[in-house]
Amino acid sequence: MRHYEIVLLVHPDQSDQVVGMVERYISQIKEADGQIHRLEDWGRRQLAYPINKIHKAHYILMNVECGQSTLDELEELFRYNDAIIRNLIIRREHAITEESLLAKSAEEKRARKAQREEAQQVAQEAE
């Protein structure tokens, strides 16, 4: 089995259905004895350029290990799912399990925000 990195851009109106879609794809991979090494939900983000007059999309990143037949099935599911406006599948040499830079920066941003809020609370209590 080979390792692949999959990025999906989901229509922003379908953001609430992303969890169900991802679960369906994960079950498809696991039924074929594949593995999910990394799954990240990047949320809604601005597109670099409009796609079909859409300016934002919900981003999903998956690193999977599966066979070619499973990958072909996934590609077909992506192609015929109207909610997915773009997909990218890249073959990787090995499994990537660490967080992506985008996920790390989001965590750092949340940590800074929490520190800032904590500092504000301490300052308010001191007054």
Curated annotation (Swiss-Prot):
GO CC terms: cytosolic small ribosomal subunit
Keyword Ribosomal protein applies: yes
Gene Ontology molecular function: small ribosomal subunit rRNA binding; structural constituent of ribosome
PROSITE patterns in the record: RIBOSOMAL_S6
Alphabetized Pfam families for the sequence: Ribosomal_S6 (PF01250)
Keyword Thylakoid among record annotations: no
Annotated keywords: Ribonucleoprotein, Ribosomal protein, RNA-binding, rRNA-binding
Domain of life: Bacteria
Biological process annotations from GO: translation
Family recorded in the similarity comment: Belongs to the bacterial ribosomal protein bS6 family.
Primary role: Binds together with bS18 to 16S ribosomal RNA.
Protein name: Small ribosomal subunit protein bS6
Organism (species): Acinetobacter baumannii (strain AB0057)
Gene this protein is translated from: rpsF
